[in-house]
Amino acid sequence: MNIRQWFKIPTPKYSAKVIFKWLWRAWRGNQLQAILNAAIGLLSVVVSLAQVWAVQHAIDVASGHTEGSIYWSVGVMALLVLCGFALRICSIWVRNILGIKAQNRMQQRMLDRILRSEWTGKESHHSGDVLNRLEQDVGTVVSFLTETIPNTISVVAMFVGAFLYLFSMDKVLAFVIVGIIPVFVLLSKLYIGQMRRLTRQVRDSDSKVQSVLQETIQHRMLIKTLESDSVMVDRLESTQSELRHRVVKRTAFSVVSNFILNAGFSVGYLIAFLWAALRMADQTLTFGGMTAFLQLVNRIQGPARDLTRLAPVFVGVFTAAERLMELEENPLEEQGDPIPLTAPCGVRLEHISYAYDDGDSNVIEQLNFDFYPGSCTAVLGETGAGKTTLIRLILALLHPNDGKVILYNQQEQKELSPLMRCNFVYVPQGNTLMSGTIRDNLRLGKLNATEEEIKTALEMSCASFVMELPDGLDTVCTEAGGGLSEGQAQRISIARALLRNRPIMLFDEATSALDPETERQLLHNILSNHDKTVIFITHKPAVVDYCDQTLHLQKQ
């Protein structure tokens, strides 16, 4: 049984080599801040060692062991102190200003990667967990790449410089002080493995807490109507208890490890102090020399202690990198220029079958249907019959296990791919408005839409009420369209779809909250354009009456 098995340390999901390659790619996007931090750190090392020499020289001049001007010595010390202040100010500026830019850049890259990846039909991570990773783990990785690595270079430089300085004063003690360090390096491998496991547990528990908080706030109205306030608070307490237990366990392990480490360094410092005192008693070391002696020992032990403290930092960044790499596991969708087709367009399903990864049977099996150009089709079926799955297949969000989805017009036909999504506009069921003004929401359909185009889309979607609001298009919607009724939010969503103006329109229960008269007027407006191919997922007879054909899906 090896050490990993003895201490029940699990095999990590990714090897250290794979994680280092991922971190290297991430570092290349943050080189400027890393290089500046490293340069400032190395200059700080030079200033710090120069201060040791300046203090020794000033004390020896004051005690008469060395000739020179005490005013000149103090002046040099003051200059070095000012240099240290200036370097610290530069370090703070680089860390704060460039640091937030680096973090923003990585968050943007990760979000872009998530949005361009294939969707498997079911999310593998809770949205609260994803947010936790994009906020906390990205911050950990950026801090490591732009601060920890440059600081490590400075620490190593300080260690080497202080050792050489001490070696020039006393060779034996220099080797004694440095000789105990490999012992801690050998112990660090076991420490890192155990701490990595504990840190991963803490981060996962932290994600669970954020997920509970997010869901509770998101569904606050439902929770109040179900009178489940105490249930959700108890659920939060349960996840927090798990987090607290794991934090206590990790902290206890860290405290014991740090105690052993600090005890070793304290013994080393006492040995150095005793050695220097004996040399002073023999008059082979001046008081200034002893001061420099002890300062150098601190400057050797300090970097050595900092290097050992890097172990939990490495653990944290390895854990954060693993969690971010998991977000990149889904393959990217096909990338390239959009492929628009001239309207009117149709969609033809040829022997389509689809089953989700965790499903025992096909949701859709051997389906053939033609949504011909300019048609209006109602898709009907009981819950679980595959209506929403069909929409996802038509939008190329999912890919059929068997068969083909063909997009065609009078001139050409092509097998559907994500690059053809530009030919569709989709209005999902429920409230799909986002935080911001009504104008912001509408321009998600067409970024450069003019005021006239927006007003026309609102009229077509029976949403002219927007212009009668006190702030009109600049009325602010809170999260999920807060401040508007369900019917108002649906009509604004339809107006957004009309602004997008694509040849094929898909509506998933998009008129469910509308009264019959408004629904009739809206359907009449939508179907007045004969170049559009319209597909309704619906249960409402009033919608079916407006359609040219129907598709009945049967539950498999």
Language-model segments: what does each one mean?
Residues 1-48, 63-76, 91-95, 99, ...:
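Membrane-integrated ABC transporters
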Residues 24-31, 119-120, 136-145, 149, ...:
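An intracellular "coupling" helix at the cytosolic face of ABC transporter transmembrane type-1 domains
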Residues 39, 43, 47-51, 67, ...:
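Hydrophobic alpha-helical transmembrane segments of ABC transporter permease domains
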Residues 228, 252, 296-327:
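Cytosolic ends of transmembrane helices, especially the final helix of ABC transmembrane type-1 domains
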Residues 389, 425, 430, 438-441, ...:
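ABC-family ATPase nucleotide-binding domain "signature/switch" substructure
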Residues 395:
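Helix-to-loop junction immediately C-terminal to a conserved catalytic motif
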Residues 431-476:
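Conserved "ABC signature" C-loop
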